Regions:
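Carbohydrate-binding surfaces of carbohydrate-active enzymes
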Residues: 1-232
């Protein structure tokens, strides 16, 4: 089963604040929107995504996106529905792998595994960032990006792992100048959250390991939580 939570986990491991929103939400409040496996498009969703990207937003979708309408009826076109020109690709078919099967791709000098779902996409103007390395679709795009208007549209054609997602989202967050809650690379088992009022920022450092961890000059004992305060 595909777990959208993997994307959430990867983003919060970059120590940024995250909202979980619906398709009906106001997209204009955000600089980056990640919509993994957005299988069903509600009426108006495609237009909202198009406008968001055109106006300078960064939008990321994956395989199995834009396939059916609100009645679970398939669109009569290649996914993602009404957005082939925006994302610069057409997803023509999906190879569903057995649990024991894997593929791989190389991105920025590092090899990552692919599992379960592999879209076979044709380029429609997008730039290829990585390609499959095995099987009959070796050489086909697995990760693409496409400039549209003032924004950027990314397409992930396959399911990878949290390690890749964390690395990839780190790059996207850097490119879009989204600030970290704390300036730090990921520390295993440490979660960082923030809350703010009119005067202060409260940063919660939480260690979910029995072993001690260090982050931002702070040492956390096993399962310890520290709260840092800073005036805004």
């Amino acid at each position: 089963m595909y777990k959208r939570q993997e994307h959430y986990e990867a983003v919060i491991q970059n120590y940024v604040s995250v909202d979980v929103i619906a398709q009906t939400a106001d997209f204009s409040r955000y600089k980056v929107i990640i919509a993994p496996m957005l299988y069903m498009f509600l009426p108006g969703t495609a237009d909202k995504i198009r406008i968001f990207i055109k106006n300078g937003g960064t939008f990321i979708i994956t395989f199995y996106s834009g396939m059916v309408n609100e009645n679970d009826l398939a669109f009569e076109c290649f996914p993602p529905f009404a957005l082939n020109d925006v994302f610069g690709i057409k997803a023509e078919e999906t190879d569903s792998l057995e649990d024991s099967d894997e593929n791989s791709f190389n991105w920025e000098g590092k090899t990552y595994k692919v599992k379960r779902y592999c879209d076979l996409v044709q380029l429609y103007g997008a730039e290829v960032m990585a390609v499959y390395e095995q099987d009959f679709y070796a050489g086909l795009p697995v990760l693409t990006k496409n400039e549209y208007g003032s924004g950027m549209a990314y397409y992930m054609a396959a399911r990878s792992d949290v390690d890749f997602l964390r690395d990839f989202y780190a790059r996207v967050l850097c490119d879009t100048e989204i600030s970290q809650i704390v300036k730090s690379e990921y520390v295993k088992d440490v979660m960082v959250k923030e809350r703010c009022d009119k005067e202060k920022q409260y940063v919660f450092l939480m260690n979910f390991s029995r072993d001690s961890r260090e982050i931002c000059g702070e040492t956390l004992k096993g399962y310890e939580v520290k709260i840092l305060e800073k005036y805004l």
